[in-house]
């Protein structure tokens, strides 16, 4: 799976452009502030209908423009193509289209799986549990088709219970029914996550060993409540506290991934450079998605040279190359990446200057 064509209109400072990227390696280079990251942001918008730089989409829309639009032609793994389009108006209207039909965000994400590697990747270690849950659930979503409907039912049950905790609006029978639904969906989500982590751990360890030597680094999964107790029991025993807090404290919404080194929190021991390398391990998820979907992720790698020394930069390039996936990489000096690829790997170069994009090397040549 890869993007054959990308059309970008009114995204930040970018001039309207049509890109014909390589199915493998694409390097966007230029001075800081030229618009390189905005290209990655446009691809991210196309695949996830949201920006990785801002929780609000209005700043993404170019100044004095009414809307921004990104269109993509996707080469499907099984053959054929699919056309995707995402448009956001300044007044708030959001349109997602797949092959001419209105679509939902989840359909978009399923069709175009993206992985982002940027200077914030190390936040997987030192950031809040929510960041690690999002990382975990991205992978589960792409390998387990039953996950999304189960997660949606869980969220509905959780909203009902939290509303009752705050306002006491449910009768005892309704409260018991929603608690049962919450427990059933929690067990289902927990099973999908555990199965995924079981498959991820050996891939994670192998991938990490190719980037950095960290003997004894372990990855474990906390499901969000005591592993030796049923959730129903935990909910009953914590009911008074939940009512005082106004929300449910135990359950899958409190799950976390834990990285430990020599029995300690890895974020407390590892240097910032080591944390960045461990953060790069998200490549491991691409292996699992490729196996489950018989297709490939698309990787967005922002400012790679500044984050790694030459040795680890080459190691990361080698891992990305071995995945045989499509990659978009930004950098200031493309010469730092010129020697990172095999001669048979098709590499396209794009120079970005003040929002204008010029292809300086065509992968087809």
Curated annotation (Swiss-Prot):
Write out the residues that bind ATP. Answer: 30-37
Q: Which GO terms describe its biological process?
A: DNA replication; DNA synthesis involved in DNA repair; double-strand break repair; SOS response
Sorted alphabetically, the keyword list is:
ATP-binding, Cytoplasm, DNA damage, DNA repair, DNA replication, DNA-binding, Nucleotide-binding, SOS response
Q: What Gene Ontology cellular-component terms does the record carry?
A: cytoplasm
A Pfam family this protein belongs to? SMC_N
Which GO MF terms are attached to this record?
ATP binding; single-stranded DNA binding
Q: Where in the cell is it found?
A: Cytoplasm
Q: Which domain of life is it from?
A: Bacteria
Q: Do you know which PROSITE patterns this protein is assigned to?
A: RECF_1, RECF_2
NCBIfam families given for it?
recf
Q: What does this protein do?
A: The RecF protein is involved in DNA metabolism; it is required for DNA replication and normal SOS inducibility. RecF binds preferentially to single-stranded, linear DNA. It also seems to bind ATP.
Protein name, as recorded = DNA replication and repair protein RecF
**Gene encoding the protein:** recF
């Amino acid at each position: 799976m890869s993007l054959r064509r990308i059309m970008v209109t009114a995204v930040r400072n970018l001039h309207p452009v049509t890109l014909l990227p390589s199915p493998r390696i694409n390097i966007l280079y230029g001075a800081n502030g030229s618009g390189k990251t905005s290209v990655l942001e446009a691809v991210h918008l196309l695949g996830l209908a949201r920006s990785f730089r801002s929780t609000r989409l209005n700043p993404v829309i170019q100044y004095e423009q009414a809307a921004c639009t990104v269109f993509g032609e996707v080469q499907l793994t099984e053959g054929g193509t699919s056309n995707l389009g995402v448009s956001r108006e300044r007044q708030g209207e959001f349109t997602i289209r797949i092959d001419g039909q209105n679509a939902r965000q989840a359909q978009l994400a399923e069709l175009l799986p993206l992985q982002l590697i940027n200077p914030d990747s190390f936040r997987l270690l030192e950031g809040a549990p929510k960041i690690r849950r999002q990382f975990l659930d991205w992978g589960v979503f792409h390998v387990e088709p039953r996950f999304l409907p189960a997660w949606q039912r869980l969220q509905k049950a959780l909203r009902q219970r939290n509303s009752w905790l705050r306002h006491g609006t449910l009768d005892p029978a309704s409260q018991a029914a929603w608690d049962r639904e919450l427990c059933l969906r929690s067990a289902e989500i927990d099973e999908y996550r555990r199965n995924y982590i079981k498959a991820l751990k050996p891939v994670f360890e192998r991938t990490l060993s190719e980037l950095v030597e960290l003997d004894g680094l372990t990855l474990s999964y906390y499901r969000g409540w005591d592993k030796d107790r049923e959730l129903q029991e935990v909910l009953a025993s914590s009911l008074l506290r939940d009512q005082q807090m106004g929300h449910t404290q135990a359950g899958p919404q409190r799950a976390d991934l834990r990285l430990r080194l020599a029995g300690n929190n890895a974020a407390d021991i590892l240097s910032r450079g080591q944390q960045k390398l461990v953060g790069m391990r998200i490549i491991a998820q691409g292996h699992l998605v490729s196996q489950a979907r018989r297709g490939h992720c698309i990787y967005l790698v922002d400012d790679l040279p500044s984050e790694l020394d030459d040795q680890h930069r080459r190691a990361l390039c080698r891992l990305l190359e071995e995945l045989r996936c499509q990659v978009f990489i930004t950098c200031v000096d493309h010469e730092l990446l010129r020697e990172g690829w095999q001669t048979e790997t098709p590499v396209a170069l794009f120079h970005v200057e003040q929002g204008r994009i010029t292809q300086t090397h065509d992968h087809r040549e």
